[in-house]
Swiss-Prot record:
Residues 5-83 form the GIY-YIG domain. This is UPF0213 protein lwe0147. PROSITE patterns: GIY_YIG (PS50164). Belongs to the UPF0213 family. Gene3D superfamilies: GIY-YIG endonuclease. InterPro entries: GIY-YIG_endonuc, GIY-YIG_endonuc_sf, UPF0213_domain. It comes from Listeria welshimeri serovar 6b (strain ATCC 35897 / DSM 20650 / CCUG 15529 / CIP 8149 / NCTC 11857 / SLCC 5334 / V8). Pfam families: GIY-YIG.
Length: 90
């Protein structure tokens, strides 16, 4: 169950190896919705999907800015972004 006032930017890896970035207040619920084909045209035909990265933010605005910035990146830069974040978490 999500706690009040939690805001996340998340990245899914789709079955076709593409990435999808999004905003949610509950990462687990949102992953289940994507896999059920609920509320997302892009991932509906690319299931199953798996959350491979998420970041927590203090505000919705910060999380949606991170989402927008990620979506503007090229595939190569998205790969680099995810590798850097993975290394930071180790």
């Amino acid at each position: 169950m999500a706690k009040a006032n939690e805001h996340f930017f998340y990245v899914l890896k789709c079955n076709d190896n593409s990435y999808y970035g999004g905003y949610t207040t509950d990462v687990t619920r949102r992953e289940a919705e994507h896999n059920a084909g609920i509320r997302c045209k892009y991932t509906k035909t690319r299931r199953p999907v798996k959350v491979i990265h998420f970041e927590k933010f203090e505000t919705r605005s910060e999380a949606t800015k991170a989402e927008a910035a990620f979506k503007k990146l090229s595939r190569k830069n998205k790969d680099s972004y995810l590798i850097e974040r993975e290394e930071d978490s180790e």
